[in-house]
Each structure stands twice: as structure tokens, then as C-alpha cells.
């Protein structure tokens, strides 16, 4: 006979899941996501062509329109990409000092995932799956995955 175990409780309510398929939710998140994206790109000194690739290959005119007027509604893919980049930025700043954290994405890396290239090259070529891999790698390094 086994004793029933009580599931641990917490006094905190779980955060609601973000539903990026809902237009209202995307509208709520887009402006701050774009501002964060452009701040990260500036901090990392990323060229506009690479920044456009990180967003999924948007046209130059669209990219500069995002920069001038972030009050819009991005699609789920772009918000997911930005979310990964924000997580990568945060993880790097947890793991490293600011100078290395802000240079890391553009530096050659011997990790076999990157094959001697930079994480930036890997992410621009590999898109969302590559961003997820980099995010998971960094989360694992900081003990979160």
C-alpha cells in the first residue's frame, strides 16, 4: 500500500501562456519586441543585412520601416525569432561580462555546433532552429537546461 503524496503548492499563480497565434497578443508584444531587437543588434554591432536575416530575410524597406515605426503587428515567426535573440542576449550577460557577452555572437567559436564559424553565421544560415539550438546551449551552460 502506498501513501498518497500531495502535489507541492505555491502561493504564486503561474504566468499565463503567451498565444502568438492571437493577433491581439502579437499586437501587444510587437512594439517592445522590435525595440529590444534593434537595441540588441546595436549592442552586438550587427550589420543590417545580418539583422534582416535574423528576422527571416525581410526586405530592406520593411526592415527600415520596422525601425522607424515599431507600432505594428509582427507575425508569429518574427516574434519567436526575437524571443530567442532576447533569451540569447540575457543568457550571455548571465554567463559573461558585458564586453565578452556583446562580442560573443560575432566571434569564431570552436564548439562543434558552429564548426569554427561564429554563432551569428550559424543563426543567419540556420534560422529559427539554429537560434533555438544556441539558446539551449547557453541555457545549459548556465545550468538551466
Task: Describe these PLM feature segments.
Residues 1-145:
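Non-transmembrane "mature" sequence context
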Amino acid at each position: 500500500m502506498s501513501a498518497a503524496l500531495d502535489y507541492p503548492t505555491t502561493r504564486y499563480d503561474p504566468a499565463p501562456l503567451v498565444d502568438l497565434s492571437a493577433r491581439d497578443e502579437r499586437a501587444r508584444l510587437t512594439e517592445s519586441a522590435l525595440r529590444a531587437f534593434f537595441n540588441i543588434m546595436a549592442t552586438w554591432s550587427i550589420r543590417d543585412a545580418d539583422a534582416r536575416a535574423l528576422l527571416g530575410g525581410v526586405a530592406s524597406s520593411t526592415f527600415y520601416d520596422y525601425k522607424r515605426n515599431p507600432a505594428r503587428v509582427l507575425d508569429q515567426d518574427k516574434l519567436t525569432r526575437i524571443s530567442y535573440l532576447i533569451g540569447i542576449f540575457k543568457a550571455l550577460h548571465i554567463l559573461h561580462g558585458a564586453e565578452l557577452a556583446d562580442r560573443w555572437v560575432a566571434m569564431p567559436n570552436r564548439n562543434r555546433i558552429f564548426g569554427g564559424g561564429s554563432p551569428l553565421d550559424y543563426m543567419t544560415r540556420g534560422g529559427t532552429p539554429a537560434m533555438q539550438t544556441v539558446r539551449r546551449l547557453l541555457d545549459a551552460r548556465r545550468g538551466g537546461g
